[in-house]
C-alpha cells in the first residue's frame, strides 16, 4: 500500500482527503507561522514546505503532504483570531469587501526527499454584514480557529456572496492542484482514489 502522510492537524484537510477515499496517516508538524511582511504566495508555499519537511525525517518511504492557508486583504494578513474580539474585528474588515485566500501545498517524496510545491489563489467576496450578524457568528465559536475568522463550508458560507477560483482552496486544500502535484511526483492520484473508492464500497 502506498503511504501518504498528512503533515497537518487541520480537520478540514483531513476531511477533504477522506472524502476522496484515500488512506493516509496524520503526523502534525509544529511550525512557527509568523511570516509577516512577506509576499502572501511565497509565505503560503514556504510554510507548506516547512511543515512537510518537519515530518519527512519520521517517514521512511512515501509522500508527505504539507499545506498552509493565508488570508490576505488590502495588504494585511488575517491569521487565526486570538479571541472573540479579534474575530469580530476581522469580520468587520471582511464584510462588504473582497479578499484573497492562498493555500500553499508541498509534496515531499521519501526516501529521496524530492519536493514539489505550488499554491492556489481564490478571491472571496463577502456580502455586507450587520454588527448583530457579526456578534451572532462569533458567538457560535466557528470563527475562532479559522484563518480569516470564517469557514466557507460552515455557517460562514451564509455571508459569502461569491468566489472566483477554487472552492476547495478556501476550505483548506485545493484538490485539483493536489492532483497535479501527485503527477509531478510520478503518482496518479486518480488511480489511488479509484482503488480505495471501489474497495470501500463508495458509490
Swiss-Prot record:
<dbReference type="Pfam" id="PF02545">
    <property type="entry name" value="Maf"/>
</dbReference>
<comment type="similarity">
    <text>Belongs to the Maf family.</text>
</comment>
<keyword id="KW-0546">Nucleotide metabolism</keyword>
<dbReference type="InterPro" id="IPR003697">
    <property type="entry name" value="Maf-like"/>
</dbReference>
<feature type="active site" description="Proton acceptor">
    <location>
        <position position="68"/>
    </location>
</feature>
<dbReference type="GO" id="GO:0009117">
    <property type="term" value="P:nucleotide metabolic process"/>
</dbReference>
<dbReference type="GO" id="GO:0047429">
    <property type="term" value="F:nucleoside triphosphate diphosphatase activity"/>
</dbReference>
<dbReference type="GO" id="GO:0005737">
    <property type="term" value="C:cytoplasm"/>
</dbReference>
<keyword id="KW-0378">Hydrolase</keyword>
<protein>
    <recommendedName>
        <fullName>Nucleoside triphosphate pyrophosphatase</fullName>
        <ecNumber>3.6.1.9</ecNumber>
    </recommendedName>
</protein>
<keyword id="KW-0963">Cytoplasm</keyword>
<dbReference type="InterPro" id="IPR029001">
    <property type="entry name" value="ITPase-like_fam"/>
</dbReference>
<comment type="function">
    <text>Nucleoside triphosphate pyrophosphatase. May have a dual role in cell division arrest and in preventing the incorporation of modified nucleotides into cellular nucleic acids.</text>
</comment>
Amino acid at each position: 500500500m502506498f503511504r501518504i502522510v498528512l503533515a497537518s492537524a487541520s480537520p478540514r484537510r483531513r476531511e477533504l482527503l477522506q472524502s476522496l477515499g484515500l488512506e493516509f496517516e496524520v503526523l502534525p508538524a509544529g511550525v512557527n507561522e509568523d511570516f509577516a511582511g512577506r509576499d502572501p504566495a511565497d509565505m503560503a508555499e514556504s510554510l507548506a514546505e516547512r511543515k512537510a519537511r518537519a515530518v519527512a525525517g519520521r517517514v521512511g518511504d512515501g509522500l508527505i503532504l504539507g499545506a498552509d492557508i493565508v488570508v490576505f486583504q488590502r495588504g494585511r494578513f488575517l491569521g487565526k483570531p486570538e479571541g472573540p474580539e479579534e474575530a469580530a474585528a476581522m469580520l468587520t474588515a471582511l464584510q462588504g469587501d473582497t479578499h484573497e485566500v492562498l493555500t500553499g501545498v508541498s509534496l515531499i517524496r521519501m526516501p529521496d526527499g524530492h519536493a514539489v510545491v505550488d499554491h492556489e489563489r481564490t478571491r472571496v467576496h463577502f456580502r455586507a454584514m450587520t454588527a448583530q450578524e457579526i456578534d451572532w457568528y462569533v458567538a457560535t465559536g466557528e470563527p475562532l480557529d479559522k484563518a480569516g475568522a470564517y469557514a466557507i463550508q460552515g455557517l460562514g458560507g451564509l455571508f459569502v456572496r461569491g468566489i472566483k477560483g477554487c472552492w476547495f482552496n478556501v476550505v483548506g486544500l485545493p484538490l485539483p492542484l493536489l492532483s497535479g502535484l501527485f503527477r509531478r511526483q510520478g503518482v496518479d492520484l486518480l488511480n489511488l482514489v479509484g482503488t480505495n473508492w471501489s474497495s470501500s464500497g463508495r458509490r
